[in-house]
Swiss-Prot record:
The record marks F27, F41 as: Important for interaction with prelid3a. Belongs to the TRIAP1/MDM35 family. GO terms for biological process: apoptotic process; negative regulation of intrinsic apoptotic signaling pathway in response to DNA damage by p53 class mediator; phospholipid translocation; phospholipid transport; pronephros development. Disulfide bonds join C8-C47, C18-C37. A motif (Cx9C motif 1) lies at residues 8-18. Residues 5-55 form the CHCH domain. This is TP53-regulated inhibitor of apoptosis 1-B.
Length: 78
């Protein structure tokens, strides 16, 4: 799947490969220490945020789940 911004697609693929490799080779084998893909994700996220802004895609009112939100907090249920 391509990214929302064409200029971000290569970064997305690079991050996806990094994450999938880390998940399969480390995390699933019990090594949850560190995520070597953090910097790739940060750069990809910045690219996507810029693309959303440049394309004037409205995101107001959209709830995003982040590391500090559980699904029930994000969707308003308990």
């Amino acid at each position: 799947m391509n990214s929302v911004g064409e200029e971000c697609t290569d970064m997305k693929r690079e991050y996806d490969q990094c994450f999938n490799r880390w998940f399969a080779e480390k995390f699933l084998k019990g090594d949850g220490s560190g995520d070597p893909c953090t910097e790739l994700f940060r750069r990809y996220r910045e690219c996507v945020q810029k693309a959303i802004k440049d394309k004037d895609i409205p995101v107001d009112g959209v709830d995003f789940m982040g590391p500090s939100k559980s699904k029930t907090e994000a969707d308003g249920s308990s």
